UniProtKB/Swiss-Prot annotation:
Start-end of each ARM repeat: 74-115, 117-156, 158-197, 199-238, 242-281, 283-322, 324-364, 408-447, 456-495
Record field: compositional bias (Acidic residues): 543-558
Gene name linked to the record: VAC8
Protein name (database record): Vacuolar protein 8
InterPro entries: ARM-like (IPR011989), ARM-type_fold (IPR016024), Armadillo (IPR000225), Vac8 (IPR045156)
Biological function: Functions in both vacuole inheritance and protein targeting from the cytoplasm to vacuole.
Disordered: annotated span: 519-558, 572-630
N-myristoyl glycine: lipidated positions: 2
Any one GO cellular component localisation term in the record: nucleus-vacuole junction
Amino acid sequence: MGSALSSCCSPRRKNAYEPLLLETEREAVADLLQYLENRSTTNFFAGSPLAALTTLSFSENVDLQRSAALAFAEITEKEVREVGRDTLDPVLYLLSSHDPEVQRAASAALGNLAVNAENKLLVVSLGGLEPLIRQMLSPNVEVQCNAVGCITNLATHDENKTQIAKSGALVPLTRLAKSKDMRVQRNATGALLNMTHSDENRQQLVAAGAIPVLVSLLNSPDTDVQYYCTTALSNIAVDAANRKKLAQSEPKLVQSLVQLMDSQSLKVQCQAALALRNLASDSKYQLEIVKFGGLKPLLRLLHSSYLPLILSAAACVRNVSIHPANESPIIESGFLQPLIELLSFDENEEVQCHAISTLRNLAASSEKNKGAIVEAGAVEKIKSLVLTVPLAVQSEMTACVAVLALSDDLKPQLLEMGICEVLIPLTNSPSVEVQGNSAAALGNLSSKAAEDYAPFNAVWNKPDGGLHAYLVRFLSSADITFQHIAVWTIVQLLEAEDEQLTNNIRSSPILISSIRQLAKSPPPSRAGGAPRHDPNDPSAGSSEDEFEDGLTDQEGEGEIVSLARRILDLTEVGEEGDEFGERAGRNVPVGSHGQAPGQGQTSQVGSMGSEHAALRASVHRALSGGGRDR
C-alpha cells in the first residue's frame, strides 16, 4: 500500500488522484473515531477497523501516522491476541518512521503484541528486529525504553534468542543497560537476562561486553535491576570459561553477591545465593565465599520459611563445603543442626539431597568433623528417615553413613545405634547406588569395628534376611564390584575371630558354595593392565585417600579369587577336593597386583596389608560416595 500511495502522489497524476486519496484518509479517520467510540464491541484486528488503521499507517501525513500508532498502542494495551501479517505490517511500517512520537507509540504497540507467543515469532520473521535496533540507538529516551521493552518480550521465546543474538542487538542492549533512565536500564537488563539461557547466546553476550556492566549494576538502587543482573550473572557462571573470565576481571563480584543476600527483596536474596552456588563450582570461589563473610547470610537463609531461599542456600552451602579448607569454618559457624533438620524437609527432596551431601562433604577428611556430625545427631536422624525417603535421598544418606563408618573411633557407636538394621534392607534397594552405598557402609563398619561383634550377630538373619541374605545376593551378583565388597566384608568379619560370626558363616551352605565357586576362578594376568599406585609408596595415600586408578575388571576378579580363598582358609572348610591343614589366622599371602596367593607376596589379610588398603579405597570410592562431591 505504501508503493501505491507513492504512485498516487506522483506529479504527473497529482491533480487526478490527490482528492481521492485525501478523501480515503478522511473516511479512515471518521471510521476510526466511530470504532473507538464503540471499542468494547469492535475487533480492530480484522475487517474495516483494521483497514482504517492500515490506511492511516501508510499515509504520508505524519499526523495521521501518529493517530494510527497511538490507536494501535491503546488498543493493544487493552487486548492482546494472536494476529496475522495484515496487522503487523502497518505497525512495522510505523516503526520505521522518522518521527519520535510515531516510533514511541508503534514500539509500544509491538511490545504489547509481543506478549503473545505466536506474535513473538511473527514479529521476528517479518524483520521486526532491524527497526527496533535502530530505535534503541535513538536519542529519545521514550523511544529507547519502548524498543528495549519490545526486545525483552521477543527474547522470552527460545526460537528468537539466537536470531536476536546474531542481529547485532546485544551491543546496544549492553550500552542501554547503563542508561540514566531507570526504565530503560530495567528493560535492557531484563533483555540481557533473557539472552542468558543458552551457552551460545551467553558467549555472544560476554563478547558484547555485558559482564562488567552486569557486575556494576549489582549495586543499583533498583530491585528489579539487581534481580535481572544477579540472575543473568548466575546463568553466565554456569560455564567454566565464563567463571574464569569473572575471576580474572571482577574481583569484587563475591562481595557484591554476599551483600545482596541481605537485600530487602526475597527474589534478589535467592538469586544471589544461586549465583554464588554456580560460582562455587570452582575452588577459588568456594574459598572466597567463606573469606568474604558468605556463611552468615547463608545460615540465615537456611532458617527461612520460604522454600526458594532454603533451596538456593542449601545448594550454595553444598558447593562451598566441597573445599576441605571450608569444612571446619562451616561447622564452627553453626550449620550442623539446621542441615540435620533439613534432612526431614519432605516438602522438597532436592533440599534433603543438598543437606545430606553437605554433611557428607563436611565429614570427608577430618576425624574431628566426623565426630561432630555424629554427636549432633545426624546418624539418628538418618536412621529414622532413610527407609522412607526418596531414592535420591537414600543414595546420599547411605553414602554419608559409609563415609562416617570409615572412622574406627565411631564404628562402635554407629553399631550401637543399630545402623545395620536400616542398611541391610537397603542392600536390596531398586537403586544400584543405594545398594552399593549401603553395602560399602556395612563393609566399613565390619573393618576393625570393635572387640564386640554382637551387633553383626544380631542382624545375621534379620531384618529382610539379614546380613546373611545380603552377602548371598552380592556374592552371586553379576557385578564384580558387588562380589568384591561382599568377599572383602566377609574377610573382615572372620578376622574379628568372633566365634558366633565364624560359625554363622561356616554353617551357611549357600554362602560357602558361593565362596567356593569364586575361589575356583583362575586369577587373570596383569599383562596389559593399567599401572596402579605402589601400595608401599606413602605418596600413594592411605586407605581413606582417593584411589584414582582403581582396579580393572581383570584385577578385580583376581582380588576376588584371593579373598575367596582366604575366606575358605579362615573358615577351615577349604575348596572341594583340597586339603587345608593350617589354622585360620596364619600368615597367608594375599594376591598382590592380581596374582594368586603363594607367588612370593608377603601382604597379609590378617594385618590388613597395604594391597587391601588400596582395594578398600577403590571399593569405597566406587560405592560409598567416598568422600566429598566433585
